[in-house]
């Protein structure tokens, strides 16, 4: 019996692209977060019933431009956002208020991440720098020239490994870079992409990194060795990548569909294309730009350019 994914529900609340989705680490949590070009972050309460999968419980407002990224703290109490207004914000999810503003980037913030212990924050920006912050909103370090990216920094992620703490970044200079967190020095340049890199993601055990972007190729890297292991052809621009938390799967949100690979066999598990009611010939078919798995790996949340979150459930097909 093969595992496949079925469209379970659609969450409607945003009025513009769903740019990022964050799920809590606690599998029993009923919260989901989504960031959007409508300048808000929605806090969803998931009921998972047939009639009502979930509703937007709260809207976090304060950014003056598109919210490009959102991540949730490991205790589920706070979230962090990055916006095209050039700032980061730390939000208290219980009150829905901003507790910190992080000011320092000179252009749009494209990506944010929390360290495993939530004590450090990293951000990537169109100003071509990577900044490291503490939770008080103080910038502790800026990575720029000569080791940094020479174009926009599109994505930054911490490795879950606490023994050898590293940051992975991707940029529009076609580079994936691995940074040593202890001294913010460059550990490896991962070279191979032929177009800008939109997304990088680190596997749950911290051993692998996957990157993707304009060239439509998902590249898998060994983080300890700094070497490319293999490539998977998605056949279209990759907007987002994420590893399953409990299966050896990699998911790619592309311009045409969501592809899911089994990394053991390097074969496609599923290719997800929802049906859209396109009324006019000129209408752009919505596509997926953000992905997140539930903590238990049973549900995949996907954010689309039509402002909707489509919820996919993993099940068996005979």
Curated annotation (Swiss-Prot):
Disulfide bonds: none
GO cellular component term, pick one: ribonucleoprotein complex
One Pfam family in the UniProt entry: WD40
GO molecular function: ribosome binding; translation regulator activity
Origin: domain of life: Eukaryota
Residue ranges of WD repeats: 13-45, 62-92, 104-134, 148-180, 192-222, 233-262, 283-313
Protein name (record): Small ribosomal subunit protein RACK1
Species classification: Eukaryota, Viridiplantae, Chlorophyta, core chlorophytes, Chlorophyceae
């Amino acid at each position: 019996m093969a595992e496949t994914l079925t469209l379970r529900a659609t969450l409607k609340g945003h009025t513009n692209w769903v740019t990022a989705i964050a799920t809590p680490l606690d599998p029993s949590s009923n919260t989901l977060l989504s960031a959007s070009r409508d300048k808000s972050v929605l806090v969803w309460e998931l009921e998972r019933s047939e009639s009502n999968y979930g509703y937007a419980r709260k809207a976090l407002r304060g950014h003056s431009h598109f919210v490009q990224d959102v991540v949730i703290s490991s205790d589920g109490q706070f979230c962090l956002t990055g916006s095209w207004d050039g700032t980061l914000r730390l939000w208290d999810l219980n009150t829905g208020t901003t507790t910190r503003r992080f000011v320092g980037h000179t252009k749009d913030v494209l990506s944010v991440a929390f360290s495993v212990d939530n004590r450090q924050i990293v951000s990537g920006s169109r100003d071509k720098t990577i900044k490291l912050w503490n939770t008080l909103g103080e910038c502790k370090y800026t990575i720029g020239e000569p080791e940094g990216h020479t174009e926009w920094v599109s994505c930054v992620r911490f490795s879950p490994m606490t023994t050898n703490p590293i940051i992975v970044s991707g940029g529009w200079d076609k580079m994936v870079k691995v940074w040593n967190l202890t001294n913010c020095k460059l550990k490896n340049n991962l070279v191979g992409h032929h177009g800008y890199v939109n997304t990088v993601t680190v596997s749950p055990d911290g051993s692998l990194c996957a990157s993707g972007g304009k060239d439509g190729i998902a590249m898998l890297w060994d983080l300890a060795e700094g070497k490319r292991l293999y490539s998977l052809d998605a056949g279209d621009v990759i907007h987002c990548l994420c590893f399953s938390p409990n299966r050896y799967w990699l998911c790619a949100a592309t311009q045409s569909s969501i592809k899911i690979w089994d990394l053991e066999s390097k074969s496609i598990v599923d290719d997800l294309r929802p049906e859209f009611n396109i009324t006019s010939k000129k209408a752009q078919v919505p596509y997926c730009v953000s992905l997140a798995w539930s903590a238990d790996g049973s549900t995949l949340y996907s954010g689309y350019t039509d402002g909707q979150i489509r919820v996919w459930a993993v099940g068996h097909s005979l």
